[in-house]
């Protein structure tokens, strides 16, 4: 059980906004509304399908390695933007015992880091997917040193995503950040998405598996972005 009061405090939003979150999550059949709060419909308080977290995900170990490498790029006391997705969640797991400022539009990330020594700022107002990703007000006053994104796919020109709303939201933080890092797992090389997040020239670093296709390795080798293989 989590109370509306506690969830409102964690997210730093108004009670009415929390009510909208819970209503949407109930519509997605992720929670059950009860008096004063909500209960999970799964065994853990997850806004995502069980495979989102568990090692029955065929790319689980790869995501763990990608998240570990990404966390190594974050210095203590830095302010970073963390987008949504499983790869980002594995990065967030490595930050539980750190002390940094996190700006995120991911409900799973914000709840994972709540109660730690990290300062967590949740941006966005409306959950638009069963992964608990928020869009809406990005808070133009927030400045970040680094932005970490997990694109849904790649093509010859850059990183893409399936949702235009998510793309437009992440573009704001890509423009704000002094450094942008993309985290890419093997699955993303096999997928296509209609909306472009940014070109390869717009990122400063790319973290990807050693199993990445040779043609993409060649693209990154000829690009200004630092490439990290795991």
Language model: regions and residue ranges:
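HTH-adjacent hinge/linker in prokaryotic transcriptional regulators
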Residues: 1-5, 9-81, 92-101, 113-118
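Short, active-site-adjacent cap segments at secondary-structure transitions
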Residues: 39-40, 88-90, 110, 155-156
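Residue-level recognition of conserved structural "scaffold" positions that shape functional pockets
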Residues: 90-92, 131
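Short, well-ordered beta-to-alpha junction loops that form the rim of enzyme active sites
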Residues: 84-86
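Conserved phosphate- and dinucleotide-binding cores of soluble alpha/beta proteins
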Residues: 3-5, 12, 27, 33, ...
């Amino acid at each position: 059980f989590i109370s509306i009061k506690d969830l409102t405090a964690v997210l730093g939003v108004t009670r009415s906004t929390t009510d909208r979150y819970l209503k949407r999550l109930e519509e997605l059949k992720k929670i059950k509304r009860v008096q004063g709060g909500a209960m999970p419909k799964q065994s853990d308080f997850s806004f995502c399908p069980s495979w989102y977290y568990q090692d029955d995900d065929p790319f689980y170990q790869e995501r763990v390695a990608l998240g570990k490498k990404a966390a190594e790029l974050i210095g203590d006391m830095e302010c970073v933007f963390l987008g949504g997705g499983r790869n980002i969640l594995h990065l967030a797991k490595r930050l539980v015992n750190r002390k940094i400022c996190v700006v995120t539009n991911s409900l799973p990330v914000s709840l994972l880091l709540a109660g730690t020594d990290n300062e967590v700022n949740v941006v966005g107002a409306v959950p638009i997917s069963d992964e608990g990703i928020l869009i809406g007000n990005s808070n133009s006053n927030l400045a970040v040193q680094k932005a970490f994104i997990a694109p849904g796919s790649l093509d010859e020109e850059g990183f893409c995503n399936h949702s235009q709303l998510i793309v437009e939201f992440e573009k704001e933080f890509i423009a704000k950040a002094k450094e942008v890092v993309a985290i890419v797992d093997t699955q993303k090389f096999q997928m296509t998405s209609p909306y472009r997040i940014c070109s390869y020239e717009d990122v400063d670093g790319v973290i990807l598996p050693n199993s990445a296709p040779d043609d993409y390795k060649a693209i990154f080798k000829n690009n200004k972005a630092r490439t990290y293989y795991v």
